[in-house]
């Protein structure tokens, strides 16, 4: 049961982490683009 629980946690954390990195990179890109313009 512990392995299944940890596996579920990992499957839940990975998409959230990827989404967070994507949003952060997008905001930095927009911010840099605004500064250039």
Swiss-Prot record:
UniProt-listed SUPFAM superfamilies: PetG subunit of the cytochrome b6f complex
InterPro entries, per database record: Cyt_6/f_cplx_su5, Cyt_6/f_cplx_su5_sf
TM region(s), chain numbering: 5-25
A molecular function GO annotation: electron transporter, transferring electrons within cytochrome b6/f complex of photosystem II activity
Keyword Zinc (UniProt): no
Keywords, sorted A to Z: Electron transport, Membrane, Photosynthesis, Plastid, Transmembrane, Transmembrane helix, Transport
Principal place of residence: plastid
Pfam families per record: PetG
Disulfide bonds: none
KW Transcription (keyword) present: no
A GO CC term attached to the entry: cytochrome b6f complex
Membrane topology recorded in Swiss-Prot or TrEMBL: Single-pass membrane protein
Annotated GO biological process: cytochrome complex assembly; photosynthesis
Localization (cell): Plastid membrane
Subunit and partners: The 4 large subunits of the cytochrome b6-f complex are cytochrome b6, subunit IV (17 kDa polypeptide, PetD), cytochrome f and the Rieske protein, while the 4 small subunits are PetG, PetL, PetM and PetN. The complex functions as a dimer.
Family named by the database record: Belongs to the PetG family.
Record's function text: Component of the cytochrome b6-f complex, which mediates electron transfer between photosystem II (PSII) and photosystem I (PSI), cyclic electron flow around PSI, and state transitions. PetG is required for either the stability or assembly of the cytochrome b6-f complex.
Protein name from the UniProt record: Cytochrome b6-f complex subunit 5
Name of the gene this protein is made from: petG
């Amino acid at each position: 049961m512990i392995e299944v629980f940890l596996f579920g946690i990992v499957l839940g954390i990975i998409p959230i982490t990827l989404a967070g990195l994507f949003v952060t990179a997008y905001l930095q890109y927009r911010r840099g683009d605004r500064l250039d313009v």
